[in-house]
Amino acid sequence: MSSRGTRFRSESTLAVDGRTGATVRQVTAAPAIHHHPFFFVPAYDDAMRRLVFVSHRTGAPQLFAEERASGDLVQLTDQPGIAEWSVHPSHDGRFVYYTAGAEGWRVDCTTCEAEQVAVFGDVALREQGMVGAAMGTTALSRDDRWWAVKFNEGPVACLAVVDTRDRSWEVILRRDTIGHQQFCPDDDTLLFYAGPLTDRVWLVNRDGSGNRRLHERAPGQWVTHETWLPGRRELAFVDWPHGMRAIDVDSGAERQVTTVNAWHAASRRDGRRMVADTNFPDIGLQLFDPTDGVGAPTTLCHPAASSLGAHWAGPFPYADGPVAVHAPQHTHPHPSFAPDGSRVVFTSDRTGFAQVYEVTVGEEFA
């Protein structure tokens, strides 16, 4: 018997960050791994009716949502083989998109009925490993029509775009490696994708034309964790551990965003604030203005996550190609804003199990 639609009573508890005074709400509490979607993927629908997360409480990763109206936690899926970092809620709140096996799926958030959206054939939707392209993240355009999914045909990486209206799809790009694809929030005909670790920052048009490098890294530079800045047609990236930079995708102009050791940074919907976790050293979640060329940081709270990944403490490790690393993603905070900017969702394993949290953002950061 399927456990889809099972409701769990609210597990919410409130606490105050002892160093910043911020109000922190723990959303999940079961003794299992939980995490929200990756940092550049929204965890909420636009109306904030639900907070979507992944829970292992049933013994395998399944999609769940916290309902705002009731506080209940609702199990949305009961399906084997879900790629837990492929999760992408639709902006209109109707569906959550995800991959399982070699197929694309979506689940109706009201009925918990899952439907197949695409069958990609004899392919691998994830590469080996814990980071980058191995995570299997997907991207949904701002209007919820276009869904970008990466898979591998043998050694060849393929980027497919699915039309969610008629469920047709086509491969728009084939190359050596593709990961972390993201639609531009202001132009659903344009995508960023991460290429090789030594040459990461690329753009491609939704129809497959215009594949081009946006940034060429300097020797020894560690470029990672790219994300769009809404309203500006700029792509920001982490220049680890020296801060963040941004590039105008039309002019190619490059600028400094912040010098704080931002690790995973996400923009607020209006593009006027970013939030980032930090590591080596972990100085907590940092808020800053990404538009003023300074990005002076203010500490929001301290997730106290284990943030595993010892390779981040040293120089760029991928000069001679990929290397094996131990960096379980559920140990990383991956903060991101709610659509209205009133709170930030993050994950922390500080209790011994990875749980989902929200922290309130004060009015002084409006």
Where are these regions (language model features)?
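Blade-level signature of beta-propeller repeat domains, shared across WD40, Kelch, NHL, RCC1
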Residues: 328-366
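Multi-bladed beta-propeller domains
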Residues: 15-35, 66-83, 109-132, 161-177, ...
